[in-house]
């Protein structure tokens, strides 16, 4: 299950069309996937519609087999085959997981002083209807009250609207990884305890490994991930926190990396041949 996925609704960063993500996911034999766009839930309606469209086709096939199962004239062999096929089709029902990669202010959404206050990254997933309502509330507050470069929330809002939510510590831009990279291991552990205290077993440490041999790709991210992952794994063991491995999906197919590279040039306002411009690892496809 992919739990860290960006669509084109991650504006000028993600490149994946929502139906293409679902198509690739199901064709690859994966029947659950989250959508976690940067700071917004703009794609959730399209995500739910695409999932329902796919599931509708599967359910139609199940109904056809149920007709055979209930056919008084069908022999036992056909009914047995139909029962097996129904069980098989049920495993192909897609579970869309509604989420968001939020920006979480390090102190408060009221504090707006410099780059640091733009916010850490944080993966938030709704595990039930109440979680969906709380996720919508957080997203709305982030835009209405917390906007500073990015739509932001903070710890107090997470505590207030925590019910029904699952939290993952996110990429290198997350609170724990940022503190680890700054040498503040104690601070990272304190943050971990805060999340565990609020979310309990619904808080997960997230690790990523974007090793790359692609030309013109970021070669440093993997090294930083390896260093951070060692500390995260140690903290997970020390605090009995569950770990999830994710890929920071920004495009659907491997060959889309070059087009995505150009998109990043647009979003950062840099020329393609600028040696100092931002690069991704080109590993950010739906694997």
Task: Tell me the role of every PLM-derived stretch.
Residues 1-287:
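Phosphodiester-processing cores and adjacent nucleic acid-binding clamps
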């Amino acid at each position: 299950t992919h739990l860290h996925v960006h669509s084109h609704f991650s504006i000028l960063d993600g490149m994946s069309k929502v139906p293409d993500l679902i198509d690739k996911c199901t064709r690859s034999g994966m029947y659950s996937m989250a959508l976690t766009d940067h700071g917004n839930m703009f794609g959730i309606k399209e995500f739910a519609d695409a999932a329902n469209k796919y599931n509708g086709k599967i359910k139609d096939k199940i109904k056809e087999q149920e007709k055979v199962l209930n056919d008084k004239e069908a022999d036992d062999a056909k009914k047995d085959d139909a029962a097996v096929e129904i069980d098989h089709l049920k495993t192909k029902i897609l579970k869309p997981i509604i989420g968001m990669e939020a920006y979480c202010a390090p102190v408060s959404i009221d504090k707006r002083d410099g780059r640091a206050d733009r916010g850490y990254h944080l993966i938030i997933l709704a595990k039930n209807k109440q979680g969906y309502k709380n996720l919508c509330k957080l997203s709305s507050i982030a835009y209405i009250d917390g906007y500073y470069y990015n739509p932001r929330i903070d710890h107090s809002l997470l505590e207030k609207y925590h019910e029904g939510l699952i939290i993952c510590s996110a990429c290198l831009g997350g609170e724990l990884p940022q503190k680890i990279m700054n040498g503040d291991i104690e601070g990272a552990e304190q943050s971990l305890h805060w999340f565990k205290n609020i979310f309990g077993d619904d808080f997960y440490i997230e690790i990523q490994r974007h090793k790359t041999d692609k030309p013109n790709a970021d070669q440093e991210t993997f090294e930083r991930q390896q260093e951070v992952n060692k500390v995260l794994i140690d903290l997970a063991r020390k605090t009995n926190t569950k770990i999830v491995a994710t890929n920071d999906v920004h495009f659907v197919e491997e060959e889309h990396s070059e087009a995505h590279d150009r998109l990043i040039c647009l979003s950062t306002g840099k020329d393609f041949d600028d040696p100092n411009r931002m690069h991704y690892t080109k590993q950010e496809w739906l694997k």
